[in-house]
Amino acid sequence: MSYYLNSENHLDSGPIYVRENGQLHMVNLALDDVRSSLQKPRPFRLFPKGFSVELCMNREDDTAQKEKTDHFIFTYTREGNLRYSAKSLFSLVLGFISDNVDHIDSLIGFPEQIAEKLFSAAEARQKFTEPGAGLRALQKFTEAYGSLVLCSLCLRNRYLVISEKLEEIKSFRELTCLDLSCCKLGDEHELLEHLTNEALSSVTQLRLKDNCLSDAGVRKMTAPVRVMKRGLENLSLLDLSCNPEITDAGIGYLFSFRKLNCLDISGTGLKDIKAVKHKLQTHIGLVHSKVPLKEFDHSNCKTEGWADQIVLQWERVTLEAMKPQETLESRTAAQHFYGKRARTEAPGKYPLTEAHMNSSEKLQFYKEKAADCHGPLLKHEALSSQESKKSKKRAFEEPEKEQGSSSQTSKQKYVCLAVEDWDLLNSY
């Protein structure tokens, strides 16, 4: 009986309410005249316990919420109260364009002051590190502003950045200084071929130290200058040190750089150094320096321009992508388990392969001033002419002023010959 009552109570749908004489009463069902004691009814809940109501006007992601609050500037008053003010229309428009900078058609003719602010805003949002979109955005700036975006680029020992951001690096125009030292490019690298393009004809300082170059690479680099008088025709400083595959034949290709003032060929595979010194002095007027030149100490080369911080962002992103996924502790534990020797961790930047050369072993050349150009030859001929004139004056005393003035003018004409004239005379 008790089991039956329990089962009925279990299947009971709840209390029954009856209105009688305007009052509401609860009637419990009784089975076989068994009346259960009246129990207090349990209140029904429309929602489960712990339910809370949240008013959601518009469900958006965090970026959309950030955009809504980004329109205001929050400050605190002296009393400590929070005060907000709306940003200027220029700031709002600048932020919107920088978020969509890769969709700009062209920036040619746009004011430089506004373009610099737009570039800084896009850089702060790291738009130039995005694959695809960053390259398109960077090309819009470089084709419109050239050297303002970047006039000097130092990629010394940053071979990972070159391999990952090659197209972005090739988009820079009107560079004047380019440092690619210790990047192991080789003769067939795409960037070495890009150096001969007209977009980099403005380069005046080029450093290719320790890049596994040979005579073939030097020939390829100088071909546009030798054949079509284009390419690196404005080059004034060249560093080819620590490239042992460059021989005497490769140095001969450098004679086409008529504006070259400083040259470093230390650590190359030269056979007849004395003959190379003579050829450099004869053809392009470069004299061997007995002391190291300050132009090759790498103190003046650095990245300059609007995009100087972008290169650092590229390097940081590249290094983070190259980090190993496994931790050092798990690796050492596995090595101890399998009985292997610990592997020495390679540093992020390899040391220079340059041998520690003394100052006497350095082959650095410089061009003397215009008055001292082709110094030994010019001084010798000037001294011989003066001695011959003195002997003539002693033997034939001619006190006429006209002949004296004519000899002085002829001497001035002789000294003021151009460098090309001396090269032509020395070729006979």
UniProtKB/Swiss-Prot annotation:
Residues 379-412 are annotated as: Disordered. Coiled coil: none annotated. It holds the Pfam family LRR_6. LRR repeats lie at residues 149-170, 174-195, 202-222, 234-255, 259-280. Gene3D superfamilies: Ribonuclease Inhibitor. Keywords: Leucine-rich repeat, Phosphoprotein, Repeat. The modification Phosphoserine is found at residues 406-407. It comes from the Eukaryota. InterPro entries: Leu-rich_rpt, LRR_dom_sf, LRRC42. SUPFAM superfamilies: RNI-like (SSF52047). The keyword Transport does not apply. The keyword Disulfide bond does not apply. Residues 394-403 have a biased composition (Basic and acidic residues). Belongs to the LRRC42 family. PANTHER family: LEUCINE-RICH REPEAT-CONTAINING PROTEIN 42. This is Leucine-rich repeat-containing protein 42. It comes from Bos taurus (Bovine).
